[in-house]
Amino acid sequence: MGKNKLEKFADMASYPHVFEYPYSAVDNVPFDMKGKWHQEFFGNDHPIVLELGCGRGEYTVGLGRMFPDKNFIAVDIKGSRMWTGATESLQAGMKNVAFLRTNIEIIERFFAAGEVSEIWLTFSDPQMKKATKRLTSTYFMERYRKFLKPDGIIHLKTDSNFMFTYTKYMIEANQLPVEFITEDLYHSDLVDDILSIKTYYEQQWLDRGLNIKYIKFRLPQEGVLQEPDVEIELDPYRSYNRSKRSGLQTSK
């Protein structure tokens, strides 16, 4: 029989590789691990990679297995979902994986300048009504700059045409260096081991016949970021925990 939410929360509170700091608990309180993840938790100087909005954490666990010479931190506010990946990685004895339960809106509170090498955004909510909530908006890019290494890598993997299109416009508006881009990942030349890791929700989109889109780009430290001023067609479908929530056909 599966565990209920309260049992999962109790597990998470006891796991040594889980850090729980929701917004309500860290308001103006410094995070002791900031700037010390390498020496105090991972015990090495390997690159740190974040997955923001990790859901169940399958992608982080998959990457951690694939790259023992990198450190991975999965971030989400939903502890009951993260429990799946946190439990799997603990039972597997993985030492290069951690989980941070917090609000992504305050992500810069947990990492020092240059402490993170890469960011993965896997099937993030496209937030079609409000640009400042999108994890690829300039609002968040400014946050990422506070802890990402110069020219650090950002990966976007999404089912949402809206999110993909918006991100392309954001990249173009700011002339950010793009390393790879495709509107149909599994029919492109880049289906390598990393990108073939499939999350629970990704498989749902594939089963519904949706193409998976992918962009890999770099974020320089210099330059004032400009938010794109364009109208983008909204996604016509409803997906897990997502809806247009609006009668509009386009949004900025």
Swiss-Prot record:
Organism of derivation: Bacteroides thetaiotaomicron (strain ATCC 29148 / DSM 2079 / JCM 5827 / CCUG 10774 / NCTC 10582 / VPI-5482 / E50)
Q: What's the family?
A: Belongs to the class I-like SAM-binding methyltransferase superfamily. TrmB family.
Name a biological process GO annotation.
Answer: RNA (guanine-N7)-methylation
Known InterPro entries for this protein? SAM-dependent_MTases_sf, tRNA_(Gua-N-7)_MeTrfase_Trmb, tRNA_methyltr_TrmB_bact
Q: Could you tell me which Pfam families the record lists for this protein?
A: Methyltransf_4
Task: Report the domain of life of the source organism.
Answer: Bacteria
Query: GO CC: one term?
Result: tRNA methyltransferase complex
The EC designation for this entry is: 2.1.1.33
Instruction: Give the enzyme's main class according to its UniProt record, as a single word.
Output: transferase
**Protein residues bound to substrate:** 129, 159, 199-202
- Cell inner membrane among the record's keywords? no
Designated gene of the protein? trmB
State the reactions this protein catalyses. Answer: guanosine(46) in tRNA + S-adenosyl-L-methionine = N(7)-methylguanosine(46) in tRNA + S-adenosyl-L-homocysteine
| Active site residues per record | 125
Protein name, please?
tRNA (guanine-N(7)-)-methyltransferase
Q: Which positions in this protein are listed as binding S-adenosyl-L-methionine?
A: 51, 76, 103, 125
This protein's pathway reads: tRNA modification; N(7)-methylguanine-tRNA biosynthesis
Keyword line: Methyltransferase, S-adenosyl-L-methionine, Transferase, tRNA processing
Annotated GO MF terms:
tRNA (guanine(46)-N7)-methyltransferase activity
